[in-house]
């Protein structure tokens, strides 16, 4: 067991709070978080911080309300702000965790806290690694918990992560009876599996934490050795060995945490990219991958409501700037080779929008889907996403993409009534 002074002596050199003045402490009332609260309260002047308390009452035990009342009383006595939230909905480990961190984030944003501090220690780290091994997690997810990571408008800090539970002083706290319920995997790991494994190897927890550290260093080294590779460039990607491609794609997918592909889905995606089959491929959760001749990109499908928000209406004889272009009905006085003019056979308002599923344009004797037009003309992903569709009287009259404009073919008896002029806005 260590004293708070000994803990402080180790923590101060890590400068966790160097860039923070107001920090929010997640306090459940258990022994770990109560130790964290007392430690930061005692050393807040030396750390040059001011603290606040965030507590979530999960309403799952009869003692929950008395624990909340105690924390409120403690905070009032020590003149510390406290924020409390009551969990609502169907309880599960994940639902409770999501609720807690959404609450912590909202408090940080509303009250200008730049850091959230939690009491995770090395035993929690080992539990997390063992749980992920049991669940069959990927190698990169065996890196465990980080001592500092981005969160909300600042950082999530875990200053106790290098200490074990037995290092923390004895202190008044509440015992959570649900920690003994074996219906939760973490409780089975903590109360059943780890004690048995420690009988085989008393340093098993240290071994798991060393595994997490080395795994983290391994993936950091991989990033440093491959940071010159543009993963989404098909030429560069396919020049790599199959093993490097595997981990490059894994690394790229880390940018889409809610996509969460199964191993079979990941393997299928890798095969599609390796064979460079051009086109759109649906993945899951509204995500798809688009592959063209030169590159690939994963994008979340934009809901129709979002597409509607992006629409603009251009009335006759008015001006409108939309994205990188200015639309008007008056030509420039000087001849400008860059100005595009579009003949209009109606004076109705013109809707400017993004491409939507099923869009097509008439070229006279035949019509063509916009999607097929983009594929045939080999436009890049970025060009397709930035394309502007002009719609008048429920017909697409032009498609503006890249440096090209495609016009609807006029009917034989159409009479031109006006012209629409399009100028690219200068960026400076």
UniProtKB/Swiss-Prot annotation:
Its main location: cytoplasm. It catalyses: cytidine(34) in tRNA(Ile2) + L-lysine + ATP = lysidine(34) in tRNA(Ile2) + AMP + diphosphate + H(+). InterPro entries: Lysidine-tRNA-synth_C, Rossmann-like_a/b/a_fold, TilS/TtcA_N, tRNA_Ile_lys_synt, tRNA_Ile_lys_synt_N. GO terms for cellular component: cytoplasm. Belongs to the tRNA(Ile)-lysidine synthase family. It is found in: Cytoplasm. It comes from Streptococcus pyogenes serotype M3 (strain ATCC BAA-595 / MGAS315). One of its GO terms (biological process) is tRNA modification. Its EC number is 6.3.4.19. It comes from the Bacteria. This is tRNA(Ile)-lysidine synthase. The N-terminal region contains the highly conserved SGGXDS motif, predicted to be a P-loop motif involved in ATP binding. ATP binds at residues 28-33.
């Amino acid at each position: 067991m260590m004293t708070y002074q000994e803990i402080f002596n180790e923590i101060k050199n890590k400068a966790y709070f160097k860039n923070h003045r107001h920090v929010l402490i997640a306090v459940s009332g258990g022994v770990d978080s109560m130790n964290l609260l007392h430690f930061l309260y005692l050393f807040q002047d030396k750390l040059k911080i001011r603290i606040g308390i965030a507590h979530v009452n999960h309403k799952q035990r009869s003692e929950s309300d008395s624990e909340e009342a105690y924390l409120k009383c403690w905070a009032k006595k020590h003149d510390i702000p406290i924020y409390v939230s009551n969990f609502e909905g169907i309880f599960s480990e994940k639902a409770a965790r999501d609720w807690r961190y959404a609450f912590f984030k909202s408090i940080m944003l509303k009250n200008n806290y730049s850091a959230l501090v939690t009491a995770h220690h090395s035993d929690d780290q080992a539990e997390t690694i063992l749980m992920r091994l049991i669940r069959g997690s990927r190698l990169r997810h065996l890196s465990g918990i980080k001592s500092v990571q981005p969160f909300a408008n600042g950082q999530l800090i875990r200053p106790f992560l290098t200490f074990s539970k037995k290092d923390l002083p004895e202190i008044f706290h509440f015992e959570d009876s649900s920690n003994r319920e074996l219906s939760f995997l973490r409780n089975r790991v903590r109360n059943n599996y780890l004690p048995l494994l420690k009988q085989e190897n008393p340093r098993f927890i240290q071994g798991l934490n060393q595994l997490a550290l080395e795994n983290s260093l391994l993936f950091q080294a991989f990033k440093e050795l491959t940071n010159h590779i543009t993963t989404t460039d098909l030429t560069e990607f396919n020049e790599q060995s199959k093993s490097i491609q595997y981990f490059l794609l894994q690394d790229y997918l880390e940018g889409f945490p809610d996509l969460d592909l199964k191993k079979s889905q990941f393997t299928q995606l890798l095969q599609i990219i390796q064979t460079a089959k051009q086109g759109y491929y649906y993945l899951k959760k509204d995500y798809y991958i688009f592959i063209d001749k030169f590159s690939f990109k994963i994008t979340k499908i934009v809901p129709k409501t979002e597409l509607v928000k992006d629409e603009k209406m251009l009335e006759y004889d008015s001006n409108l700037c939309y994205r990188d272009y200015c639309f008007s009905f008056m030509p420039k006085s000087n001849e400008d080779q860059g100005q595009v003019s579009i003949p209009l056979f109606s004076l109705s308002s013109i809707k400017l929008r993004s491409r939507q599923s099923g869009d097509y344009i008439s070229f006279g004797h035949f019509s063509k889907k916009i999607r097929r037009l983009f594929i045939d003309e080999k436009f890049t992903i970025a060009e397709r996403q930035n394309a502007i569709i002009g719609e008048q009287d429920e017909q697409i009259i032009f498609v503006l993409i890249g440096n090209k404009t495609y016009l609807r073919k006029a009917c034989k008896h159409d009479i031109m009534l006006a012209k629409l002029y399009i100028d690219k806005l200068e960026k400076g």
